[in-house]
């Protein structure tokens, strides 16, 4: 049974049909005749049908029609049979290019087209069994290997054969395109492949480390001679060769041995990195020889038997330079660790123990302006100074550690700002100390010159002495020891304090150098370092005694002030007695002096006045003793005085018209009022 299928350019994709179709043309349309077989499913592809029809019909079907607007003169010159020959000669040329294109497509896309319509050449699970252990998968694995090495030539190219690469192949048996296998079980060869994969990975990791290490190694060991470089680089190269041999032998072993070689390669890598780090630190720790040359030059400076200023200050600067260069026996790291531990101790002591975690969270959330305690600030400045001297800058690790210590007191940006300020202040302080040190040293030199000249003048031959006595007197200054006064000892003590203030560690050897340098300021070896040491100790003892006396005097003045403040409170009960005396003096301002010629009535009135005043005194005493407040006492006294004066005025007004001969004379305030009653037995 056969049918004619009419199609206008559409396509139905599917399996290829073996029978060649017949092409029938009708105007612009093409008719293809396809044979249909009963019992089979027929898949028709338009492209495949057109290709097969072109092959069957031959070259005549592909002959192009002449263009409608061709040149008539050109057609007139060409014979009528010639165009067919030319066209037939040109057709194989076009077919040749088509064949090349199809070949390239088959090479890169497979044997068939990549439109997904034809699947004749696609492998199926039924055709290739990946589980079969008898089939050798070496070629398949090689095809799916991924090579990560760099190619020697760049650009677009078509190469036949194996590509040239910069490094030996470090491929790993990765198979991204291969289909997954149904079962996870693998034969013995797969285990060997996995071991090879581990070894290759370890080799690539080690080669990467080696590729990065030589650059840094060259930069670090540039100041060393070539012999030292060869000696140092021979160790890691031997390690690399040894690890390569071990990895090469492990390819023929089991997976367990391959794991052991991988661990050994990791150990070799750690060892090589450690050796590089140690050699770099040893190179950084070396100091240039210029420092020692400066020290020797400074010690040789003399002027007329007396060392100048550079002798003392040079030793101090050389010691600081040696510390900066790392030539100390103790490293700066240990000093820095010690300073950080001291800071932790001070922070723990200054931190109040009653603060809980919740309270800390509340205070940290609030924008409270916090200030560092003075002790914490001093220790932090010491840490900043040591870190600047040893590292040259403050590393992130150091700042994080300081924040873990003082983070509850200060923020991160404030800590960085304070560290910078402390370093700047430390530099300015060191400059000020150096200038002050030089100034005091010059003063000491002047004092020594004056003292030595005085000693020489005293040692000169006195009047009337012989020549032998003169020779003895000349030799006396060399035998006589120099005696210091208190002012010179104080100056030396000031030099000692300034010198010690800048030292962090190893004060013993440095102070001894200071003693020796100061002793060399005296001519003819009149002073040794022990004398300098004893003089400084004597000055310190005097200062301690002076400070102790001042402290005692200040304590005594404080005690006196406190006693004066406590006197009004303690003498509150005794105050009424003094007030009582004053009251008595005021009450007795006016004393009645009785005339012997007066009558008895005036005497009686004066007696009554005295009795009334005597009765008022206990009342005043009761009022004063009841209240210790001075303001209340003055108010009560004023009121009672006013009442007494009013009574006196009334009595005097009554007595004036009756007895004009009596006189009232005011008594002075200093006189005491007699407590005894007057004698009433007057003469008749």
Curated annotation (Swiss-Prot):
Q: Does the keyword Nucleus apply?
A: yes
* Chief location: nucleus
Per the record, GO CC terms? nucleolus; nucleus; rDNA protrusion
User: Where is this chain compositionally biased, Basic and acidic residues type?
Assistant: 157-167, 184-199, 238-260
Q: Where in the cell is it found?
A: Nucleus; Nucleus, Nucleolus
* Annotated region (Disordered), positions in chain: 108-137, 157-287, 311-332, 609-631, 660-684
Biased segments, Acidic residues type: 114-137
Per the record, where are the segments of Polar residues compositional bias?
A: 211-235, 261-284, 311-321, 611-631, 669-684
**Which UniProt keyword terms apply here?**
Chromatin regulator, Nucleus
User: What's an example GO BP annotation here?
Assistant: negative regulation of gene expression, epigenetic
Query: Disruption effect?
Result: No visible phenotype.
Q: Which Pfam family, any one, appears in the UniProt record?
A: HUN
Q: Which family does it belong to?
A: Belongs to the ubinuclein family.
Q: What does this protein do?
A: May be required for replication-independent chromatin assembly.
- Summary of subunit composition and partner proteins: Component of the HIRA complex made of UBN1, UBN2, ASF1A, CABIN1 and HIRA. Interacts with HIRA.
Official protein name in the record: Ubinuclein-1
Gene source species: Arabidopsis thaliana (Mouse-ear cress)
């Amino acid at each position: 049974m056969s049918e004619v299928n009419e199609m206008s350019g559409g396509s139905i994709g599917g399996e290829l049909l073996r029978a060649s179709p017949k092409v029938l043309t009708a105007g612009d349309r093409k008719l293809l005749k396809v044979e249909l077989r009963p019992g089979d499913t027929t898949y028709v592809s338009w492209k495949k049908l057109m290709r097969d029809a072109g092959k069957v019909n031959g070259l005549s079907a592909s002959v192009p029609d002449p263009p409608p607007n061709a040149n008539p003169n050109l057609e007139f010159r060409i014979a009528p049979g010639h165009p067919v020959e030319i066209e037939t000669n040109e057709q194989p040329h076009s077919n040749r290019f088509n064949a090349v294109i199809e070949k390239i497509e088959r090479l890169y896309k497979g044997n068939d087209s990549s439109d997904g319509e034809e699947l004749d050449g696609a492998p199926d699970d039924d055709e290739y069994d990946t589980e079969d252990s008898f089939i050798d998968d070496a070629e398949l694995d090689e095809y799916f290997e991924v090579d990560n090495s760099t190619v020697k030539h760049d650009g677009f190219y078509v190469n036949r054969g194996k590509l040239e690469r910069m490094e030996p192949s470090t491929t790993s048996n990765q198979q991204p395109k291969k289909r997954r296998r149904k079962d996870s079980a693998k034969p013995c060869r797969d285990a060997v492949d996995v071991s090879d994969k581990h070894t290759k990975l370890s080799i690539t990791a080690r080669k990467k480390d080696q590729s990065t290490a030589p650059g840094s190694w060259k930069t670090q060991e540039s100041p060393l001679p070539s012999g030292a470089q060869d000696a140092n680089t021979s160790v890691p190269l031997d390690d690399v060769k040894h690890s390569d041999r071990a990895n090469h032998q492990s390819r023929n072993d089991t997976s367990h041995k391959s794991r052991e070689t991988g661990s050994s390669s990791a150990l070799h890598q750690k060892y090589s990195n450690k050796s590089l780090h140690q050699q770099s630190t040893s190179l950084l720790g070396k100091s240039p020889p210029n420092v020692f040359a400066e020290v020797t030059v400074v010690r040789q400076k003399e002027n007329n038997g007396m060392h100048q200023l550079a002798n003392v200050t040079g030793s101090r600067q050389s010691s600081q330079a040696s510390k900066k260069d790392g030539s100390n026996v103790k490293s700066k790291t240990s000093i820095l660790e010690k300073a950080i531990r001291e800071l932790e101790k001070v922070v723990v002591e200054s931190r109040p123990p009653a603060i809980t975690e919740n309270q800390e969270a509340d205070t940290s959330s609030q924008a409270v302006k916090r200030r560092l305690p003075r002790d914490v600030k001093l220790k932090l400045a010491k840490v900043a100074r040591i870190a600047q001297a040893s590292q040259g800058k403050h590393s992130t690790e150091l700042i994080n550690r300081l924040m873990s210590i003082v983070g509850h007191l200060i923020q991160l940006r404030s800590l960085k700002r304070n560290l910078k300020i402390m370093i700047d202040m430390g530099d300015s302080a060191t400059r000020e100390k150096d200038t002050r040190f030089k100034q005091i040293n010059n003063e000491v030199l002047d004092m020594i010159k004056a003292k030595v000249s005085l000693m020489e003048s005293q040692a000169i031959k006195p009047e009337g002495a012989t020549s032998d006595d003169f020779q003895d007197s000349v030799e006396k200054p060399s035998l006589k020891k120099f005696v210091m006064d208190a002012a010179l000892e104080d100056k030396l003590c000031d030099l000692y304090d300034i010198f010690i203030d800048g030292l962090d560690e190893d004060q013993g050897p440095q102070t001894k150098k200071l003693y020796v340098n100061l002793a060399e300021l005296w001519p003819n070896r009149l002073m040794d370092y022990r004398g300098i040491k004893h003089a400084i100790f004597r000055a310190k003892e005097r200062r301690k005694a002076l400070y102790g006396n001042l402290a005692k005097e200040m304590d005594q003045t404080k005690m006196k002030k406190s006693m004066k403040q406590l006197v009004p409170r303690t003498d509150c009960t005794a105050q009424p007695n003094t007030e009582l005396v004053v009251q008595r003096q005021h009450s007795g301002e006016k004393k009645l002096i009785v005339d012997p010629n007066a009558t008895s009535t005036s005497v009686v009135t004066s007696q009554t006045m005295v009795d009334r005043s005597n009765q008022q005194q206990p009342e005043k005493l009761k009022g004063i003793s009841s209240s210790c407040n001075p303001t209340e006492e003055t108010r009560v006294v004023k009121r009672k005085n006013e009442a007494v004066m009013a009574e006196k005025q009334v009595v005097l007004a009554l007595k004036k018209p009756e007895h004009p001969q009596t006189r009232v004379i005011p008594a002075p305030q200093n006189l005491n009022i007699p407590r005894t009653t007057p004698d009433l037995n007057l003469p008749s």
